[in-house]
A protein has these predicted regions:
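Short alpha-helical hairpin
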Residues: 1-16
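A short, mixed-charge helix-start or loop-turn motif at secondary-structure junctions
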Residues: 16-21, 64-67
């Protein structure tokens, strides 16, 4: 095993009990998929492989904290816990700082109020990797899991679907609204050329799903 594989194996042991608490789609399976995307993007786009791989595997600690605290916890608030995960890893001080930086900024969106504030390839790849797991078939499944956990309706036909109303999932009128308002935008939100190509294919599937779902639930067949 190379150095990254050894470190990820250590993180798997640390992360298992912590992330097994999650039922919202931010569990170990999500971390493993995000890691795969991150390493693929790194192979095409470059960047520090250790920083990218490790940050991909521990980026969602704030989601577990959100479940525990009963409120949204930002990535910034999770940094002390993230530090505990990486303190004993065989990394340089600069690499550890870079991991913390990437994790802190991984939930920035071009269509969000604040936009994207980072430009280093490691942070951009982490954003893309996390967002790719919200696209396509897996993204749809995760959206419904999150919606169910937060008591959201699957679909509320009384509320129009708008293109300009992004919010956190639990504030949307239904899971279908969240898929429409956020997941459909992710292809245009990707930072790297490689991620844009992957997301474009996934987004076509999401659009087809939404069209069919609304037809089946409203009876407005086309």
């Amino acid at each position: 095993m190379d150095k990254l594989q050894v470190i990820i194996q250590k993180l798997r042991i640390k992360a298992k009990d912590y992330f097994d608490k999650d039922a919202s789609g931010h569990n170990v399976d999500h971390l493993e998929r995000t890691l795969k995307y991150a390493l693929y993007l790194q192979s095409k786009e470059g960047g520090d492989k250790l920083v990218i791989g490790i940050s991909a595997y521990i980026h969602d600690i704030h989601r577990i904290m959100s479940n525990e605290y009963g409120r949204y916890v930002s990535p910034q608030e999770s940094i002390p816990i993230v530090e505990m995960f990486i303190n004993d890893l065989d990394l340089t001080k600069e690499q550890k700082e870079h991991i913390l930086h990437a994790v802190e900024h991984h939930e920035e969106y071009k269509f969000g109020k604040e936009g994207v504030s980072v430009f280093d390839i490691e942070s951009l790849i982490l954003q893309d990797s996390d967002n790719l797991d919200m696209c396509g078939a897996v993204g749809i499944v995760r959206a419904f899991k999150y919606g169910f956990l937060n008591g959201m309706m699957d679909y509320n036909p009384d509320v129009p679907l708008y293109n300009n109303s992004f919010s956190e999932s639990k504030n949307d009128a239904s899971t279908i609204h969240h898929i429409h308002n956020k997941l459909l935008r992710l292809a245009d939100n990707m930072n790297t050329k490689t991620a844009k190509k992957l997301a474009s294919k996934k987004t076509k599937l999401t659009k087809d799903f939404l069209k069919m779902y609304i037809e089946e639930t409203t009876g407005n067949y086309s």
